[in-house]
A protein has these predicted regions:
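Alpha-helical multipass membrane-protein architecture
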Residues: 1-633
Length: 633
């Protein structure tokens, strides 16, 4: 371990000073933070997962700074991606929890959360996530260099280093962005062809087959890879082709809680919404908790390291440039001010006990998250599992201390939201600091940049949530908000004891069986919870990645080209996700302004046309990847 640390030399040496924290980097980073935050908010509310924004942010930064502004500094580009990627992490934490407040407002239980409340919850969680990561940097990033791989952080560094040699990678991202935006506008704006095709299988009551033919879903499947995609698809298959037909077969003319209608009269979509949601919620909750239990030895070890690192941390003014962190007195002061603000400010519906829980859970799960992403990457970080564990414990504590009813439920969601954002930002910060460690960035400036990204995206996320809710409503087919819906049900169930626990326990035991079989529970459980058509669209992208990965490489040159081939696909599909997300936000604005009907096509193509167009998109993705292009390698 020590050998790795001492032998490693960053790309930019500590004694070399190059442009880093510049006005250009700040403006571009803030812009990308807002863009990727909005795009990932839409994606997460629609499919229940987000993707890392570090690599597309780095590529776009290189393209804009070098091509448009005629400047070039690898550390400047690194700071842009550090600021820009914070937007995705704030969005991930916020959309997994905060829509629960809107759902309660829709039911008339509470008033809708204000923009200021959303901003402060996101801001507090984001700043705490950065602060908690500062004392962990030395232990996780430096001391364990060569031990913890930090997949996204290392890959982002490789992209930045490759960018020093030139290339056209930004063009690939922009092409994906443009294609997806146009595709989404034609499908869901003009409505020339349906974005979802499906058929209820009459001979197999209760089942339905379909696919959402949208670019972002293919992008998610490609980036997550064939393994995660097939686990989600398997979960969806279990729900829609086993559980739902069984409910239809055995329920028949019965009315079973929580439903209020005879089961035989329910269409597959209603069966899913009435019963499968609860089974899926039980599986997701169990999966999140099991992932924490499995990593408990790792959690304890990392926590001990973090405490030791905090005890040893000193002022770093005299340290080499590449080892300078924000001073611990400043970090501890920020944490103390935030804790007092959570306790005293009326905008936070949280008591003194809640403020204490935020700090304790926050540091604990920041430690867990930073270590987890170092091992398995940000895309596999069980942030929602940490939020579930926090919600269960905090709700039980609040209920035991007499804070019940809507006050207790709001307090639980706010605590869970802050912790969810803490975990997401801590994971993102650790990946960014690893990238900086490899390229030779200044940690202190990255930590400040991360906070800038948090502030910018926190200021925007409230407006994005209000916009999407006003356009379609959380819990709708367009934005089902799966995690937030599940968090809402979980808190209600603990506070009011009104949940259909039999259905939830079915999901829990399915998750246990899946775990025994050695299958990752969370992607399987999310597939159970989401509409099958979503999992099918994601699987399509995963199949393209699977075909590409199966190509044989006879020598080192072909292996290098195969790696470049996969990378081209990652850049293009990152653009697909961003493009559809941004167009989704634009269409939401049109829906709220009531101008969306003005550009609807008088002609609508049949469902088969949608499938053909989607296959053409997948084929284009494949041929883009396999096409040899020296400029992008």
């Amino acid at each position: 371990m020590k050998e790795n640390k001492n032998d490693f030399k960053p790309y930019i040496p500590a004694d070399q000073v190059v442009p880093e924290f510049t006005v250009t980097a700040l403006i571009l980073g803030i812009l990308l933070a807002v863009i990727f935050g909005a795009a990932n908010a839409y994606l997460g509310l629609r499919v229940g997962m987000t993707v890392s924004a570090s690599i597309p942010a780095a590529v776009l930064s290189m393209g804009i700074i070098r091509i448009i502004l005629r400047k070039n500094s690898i550390l400047e580009n690194n700071l842009v991606q550090t600021i820009g990627s914070a937007g995705e992490s704030v969005a991930a934490g916020a959309i997994f929890t905060l829509p629960a407040l809107f759902l309660w407002a829709k039911e008339g239980k509470i008033d809708s959360p204000s923009i200021l409340t959303i901003f402060l919850v996101a801001l507090v969680g984001g700043i705490l996530g950065v602060c908690f990561m500062v004392p962990l940097r030395q232990a996780l990033i430096v001391e364990e260099h060569g031990v913890l791989p930090f997949p996204e952080g290392t890959a982002c560094a490789e992209v930045l280093l490759a960018g020093e040699e030139g290339g056209n990678k930004a063009g690939i991202v922009f092409s994906g962005l443009g294609i997806a935006a146009i595709y989404k506008f034609i499908a869901d704006g003009i409505k020339l062809f349906p974005s979802e095709i499906g058929y209820d299988i009459q001979a197999y009551a209760g089942s339905s087959v379909g696919i959402q033919v949208l670019p972002a879903l293919a992008g998610v499947g490609y980036i997550c890879g064939p393994q995660i995609s097939k686990y989600m698809f398997a979960g969806g298959t279990l729900s829609w082709f086993v559980l739902m037909p069984m409910i239809a077969l055995f329920g028949k003319d019965a009315t079973i809680f929580p439903g209020s209608e005879v089961i035989s009269t329910l269409a597959p979509g209603s069966l899913w919404g009435t019963y499968i949601k609860y089974i899926g919620a039980g599986a997701v909750a169990a999966g999140g908790i099991m992932s924490l239990i499995k990593t408990s030895p790792l959690i304890v070890r990392t926590f001990k390291q973090a405490m030791g690192s905090m005890a040893k941390n000193r002022a770093t003014a005299d340290a080499p440039r590449t080892q300078r962190d924000l001073p611990m007195p400043i970090i501890l002061g920020i944490i103390a001010v935030i804790a007092v603000a959570i306790w005293l400010l009326p905008i936070f519906p949280v008591s003194f006990l809640g403020a204490v829980l935020v700090v304790i859970f926050g540091f604990f799960f920041a430690t867990v998250s930073a270590r987890m992403v170092g091992l398995i990457g940000s895309s596999n970080n069980p942030v929602s599992g940490m939020a579930i564990a926090t919600l269960i414990i905090s709700t039980l504590i609040l209920k035991a201390t007499g804070t019940t009813g809507t006050t207790g439920m709001i307090g639980s969601i706010c605590i869970g939201s802050i912790i969810c954002i803490v975990a997401a930002i801590a994971g993102d910060t650790s990946q960014d600091l690893k990238t900086g460690f490899i390229v030779g960035a200044t940690p202190k400036l990255q930590q400040i940049g991360e906070m800038v990204g948090v502030i910018a995206s926190s200021a925007a996320i409230g407006y994005v949530l209000y916009l999407l809710n006003a356009a379609w409503g959380f819990g709708s087919n367009e934005i089902p908000a799966p995690q937030a819906t599940m968090m809402k049900m979980l808190v209600e169930g603990i506070m009011n004891a009104e949940l259909p626990w039999a259905l939830i326990l079915v999901g829990v035991f399915i998750a246990i069986v899946v775990e025994i079989l050695g299958i990752p529970v969370l992607p399987f459980a999310v597939g159970m919870y989401l509409p099958f058509s979503l999992s099918a669209g994601i699987m399509a992208g995963g199949v393209v990645r699977w075909i590409l990965e199966r190509r044989k490489a006879a020598n080192e040159s072909e292996e290098k080209e195969k790696k470049a081939c996969i990378e081209r696909g990652t850049l293009f599909t990152s653009g697909l996700i961003a493009g559809e997300g941004l167009m989704g936000v634009i269409l939401a604005i049109c829906a709220v302004a009531k101008v969306d009907s003005k550009f609807v096509s008088p002609v609508a193509l049949p469902q088969i046309a949608s499938l053909v167009i989607f296959i053409i998109l997948l084929a284009y993705l494949y041929f883009l990847c396999v096409k040899k292009n020296n400029k992008t390698n």
